[in-house]
Each structure stands twice: as structure tokens, then as C-alpha cells.
Amino acid sequence: MPDFSMSNLAVAFSITLAAGLFTVLGSGLVMFSKTPNPRVLSFGLAFAGGAMVYVSLTEIFSKSSEAFAEIYDKDHAFAAATMAFLAGMGGIALIDRLVPNPHETLDAQDPSFQESKRRHIARVGMMAAFAITAHNFPEGLATFFATLENPAVGMPLALAIAIHNIPEGISIAAPVYFATRSRKKTVWACLLSGLAEPLGAALGYLVLQPFLSPAVFGSVFGVIAGVMVFLALDELLPAAKRYSDGHETVYGLTMGMAVIAVSLVLFHF
């Protein structure tokens, strides 16, 4: 496999960091503005989900199969990529089972939210931050390796994850801000959770770098594809549907796929 220059590593890490920092944007929406338009939020989440599914199944999975093809024949390479894909789905499903991700975004304008005791809400915020941080590690690893191998693949994936991180930031910020009334603490809580993505990227690269080979890259990309598809189906699309009863989810899903498809075609020219 090719040796990556410091500039390539810096670009991949910077993009991963930027995607993670979108979590902080969620805190701004809680502290400085009213609740976002549910229909717009539904469209945005579905857009990110469609983009994530499309790029995972068409580009990242293909990268896995291509890497395995350097050491196996075509059929066995596809089988190995499929096994890695299923392993990624199974692994993130296990993490989701052990550390459930809070899918319901807390709304600071909700009367029932206002009536809750601050100490209890503070615990909710800590649990949300912990759960989302645990889920951010594999997302950071996915963004980093996808961008490192091919920025044309990594950039759309990073955009999808960045959009996905905004409501996660809201999930952390709403209870923390209600409990503490401190903008500083709210921003820090979201920032620390978002930094889990570049941290996951750095740790993953340091662990895998001495062993980089076609088999390792094939496994990593297959696992990444499985993780991203699971996150889209388990988190983004259900959340999008919950925020709107109309067709925004379907429109967002198809638009996300279409935009990523066209962008990938343009990148290939």
C-alpha cells in the first residue's frame, strides 16, 4: 500500500476534526436560537443518511473489495469485503446495544423539560455526552481513512457526518444548558464529544499504521461501510421521520444520494 505524506495525513485529520466540531454548532442552536424548523431538520437528517448510505455502498465498499483483490481473486475479494462489512454492522450494533445512543433530542422549550429537576437533567446530559462520544470514535476513524485513501470519497462522507453531528450536539447541549445555565460549560461538553472523532482517527491510525497492508485496508474500509450504513439506518433516517410526517424524509434521502452521486462522478473526471 502507498506511503502517505504528512500533507495527506494533515488534510485527512483536518477534515475529520472539522466534521467533529459541527457538534458545537448544535450547542449554538440551543443557546442562541429557537428550535429549528422540524421539516428542515428532517430533510437535513435524511439528506445526510442518503449520502452516507450511497457513499458507503458504492465507494467505500468498492475500496474494500479492491484492496482485497490485491491478495485474493475477484470472488474471494468480494466475499472478504462482505465479511468485513457485516462485521462492521455487527460491531457498531453491539456498541449501540451496550451504550445506547439517545435518539430523542431534548427540547428546552418543552414544558415537561422545564419542569424536570436540574440535577436529573444534568445526569441526562452526562449520559448523552458519554453515549454520543462513544459513537463518535468509529465515525472519526471512518472519515479519516476514507479521506486518506481518496478525498473524493472522504469529503462527502465528512459532510454527511457533519450534518449528523448537529442534532447530536443539540442532544448534549439542551440538558447541560438547562441544568447549568452556563454557555461555557455547554460549549465545552459539545466540544469534548466532538473531539472524540479526531481522537478516534489518531488512535486508529497509530494502532494500524505499522500493519498497513491490502488486507488491513480492505478490512478497515469494509468495516467502515458497515458502520456507516448501520448509523444511517439506525439513527439518521428514524430521527428524520420523527421530525416530520410529510415527504421531507424521502426527499432528503433521495436528494442526498443524488448530490453525492453527482459529486462522485465529477470527482472521477
From Swiss-Prot:
Membrane topology, from the record: Multi-pass membrane protein
Binding site for Fe(2+): N136, E139, N165, E168, E197
Membrane-crossing segments per the record: 12-32, 41-61, 75-95, 126-146, 152-172, 187-207, 211-231, 249-269
Gene Ontology terms, MF aspect: metal ion binding; zinc ion transmembrane transporter activity
Annotated localization: Cell inner membrane
One GO CC annotation: plasma membrane
InterPro entries: ZIP, Zn_transptr_ZupT
Reactions accelerated catalytically: Zn(2+)(in) = Zn(2+)(out)
Family membership noted in the UniProt record: Belongs to the ZIP transporter (TC 2.A.5) family. ZupT subfamily.
NCBIfam families the UniProt entry points to: PRK04201.1
Role played: Mediates zinc uptake. May also transport other divalent cations.
Stated name of the protein: Zinc transporter ZupT
Species for this entry: Neisseria meningitidis serogroup C / serotype 2a (strain ATCC 700532 / DSM 15464 / FAM18)
Gene label: zupT
